[in-house]
Amino acid sequence: MTTKYIFVTGGVVSSLGKGIAAASLAAVLEARGLKVTMLKLDPYINVDPGTMSPIQHGEVFVTEDGAETDLDLGHYERFIRTKMSRRNNFTTGRVYSDVLRKERRGDYLGATIQVIPHITNAIKERVIAGAEGHDVAIVEIGGTVGDIESLPFLEAIRQLAVDIGRNNALFMHLTLVPYLAAAGEVKTKPTQHSVKELLSIGIQPDILICRSDRAIPANERAKIALFCNVPERAVISLKDVDSIYKIPALLKSQGLDQLVVDRFGLQCGEANLAEWEQVIYQEANPTGEVTIGMVGKYVSLPDAYKSVNEALKHAGLKNRLSINIRYIDSQDLETKGLEVLDGLDAILVPGGFGERGVEGKILAAQYARENKIPYLGICLGMQVALIEFARHVAGMDGAHSSEFKRDTPYPVVGLITEWIDEEGKVEVRTEGSDLGGTMRLGSQLCHLVEGSKVRALYGSDTIQERHRHRYEVNNTLLPKIEAAGLKVTGLSADKKLVEIVENPDHPWFVAVQFHPEFTSTPRDGHPLFEGFIQAAGEYMKRHLN
């Protein structure tokens, strides 16, 4: 079957939730038995978001094949079963980089390189490659219609719709329909102007998703349909909801999936949303609440830890517990003291980079260890747990990571000096290597030790988890740390690198080098987070009694 394309654009303002709306539609189409994939086209000049500040951009989502991508790909994987790859996200910078490399190589035979056709052709080629082998490809264009940065992408999808035939392409536009309290009504003019902007570049939207804080009345939807030249049934009201996992059912109730199926002439059954109904039921009916302290350096923007936040909530669903995440700036532990950790049922230290706030994270790991509070360390969260244990239990005073202190007497964590690149070649890295694309990335095999907590949680002796780091546990200092009581319970495929450590003298103290949050979904959860939240619930009950 010819792949059908749904191009998703946004207008009026940014942060309307294009990614979640697109992923929700994908979930309903998948529930109808269609093979669906999603792509995100980002208009910034960075080659990828790998070196961008999480406070500016939010989290970097890592795919199975090791691509550093936009956090929207995390939404895609949480809503549909299809796994994303480096083909599912690309930026203006990546496209220009490819085109310029071809120009230097002489591929264009002396032609003048222009946005049209060279850049737009490169965009179209990447979209087609990413969509290959699927019934439906939903392609989200980052940014807002009217932004200068988005123009090459919008021109490329306009051309692509012509190339593949309009019966194989559909344009879905998200807009804001604000409510003015003074007038006591919603206003449609911003939507009309946004569509006018889209029309000026040759794109007539087929479906309008109208975002608002309330349901949009039928008469206003009719008005939008009239002025924006779309059928009334193609004006979808998407009001604010208390859970993003309600959106698939909300879109289905307005017939959006049927509209798409009819437009493309697809033969498929009705959508079965039973799994999503179960998620919503679990979310609405918790039996208790636990407070998780997330100790990090990017806590001013919770989206910097988007997948961790969601993974905790997924584990809450499985344990029938409501999750209250208390964001704690790790520097506050250094300046305000340990009282900021009072009242927590568990402590989580997520990944991060740079020296700022590291001592606060080490204090959090020490507090959790000494007070028997459930602890989950992720990536840097494992490294600080190791440093803390080395300093205060193993007698290695001044132990640190060479990332933060070059002259530490005990570099218990050190730089990966040799790694395998995307093409399978050995790459030597030093302190002076580029920051972009020089990490251990993607899904890696991990061996679990028999009798360990993680072996019981996963129910398997090998697992696959995703990595994003350039520093590893220093094996030469490991025997002394293990002799003091910390146990290595997970090892890399070649059994040379430490992936998981546990403290057997603690009710629940697990720290991992990988990022388990990237594989957690609302329907399936993740065993590590489920075990962590279960331990938090047990800790909460013990202290209530």
From Swiss-Prot:
Residues 1-266 are annotated as: Amidoligase domain. GO terms for cellular component: cytosol. CTP binds at residues 14, 147-149, 187-192, 223. Gene3D superfamilies: 3.40.50.880, P-loop containing nucleotide triphosphate hydrolases. The active site is at 379 (nucleophile), 515, 517. ATP binds at residues 15-20, 72, 239-241. Its EC number is 6.3.4.2. Catalyzes the ATP-dependent amination of UTP to CTP with either L-glutamine or ammonia as the source of nitrogen. Regulates intracellular CTP levels through interactions with the four ribonucleotide triphosphates. This is CTP synthase. It comes from Tolumonas auensis (strain DSM 9187 / NBRC 110442 / TA 4). The lineage of its organism: Bacteria, Pseudomonadati, Pseudomonadota, Gammaproteobacteria, Aeromonadales. The gene is pyrG.
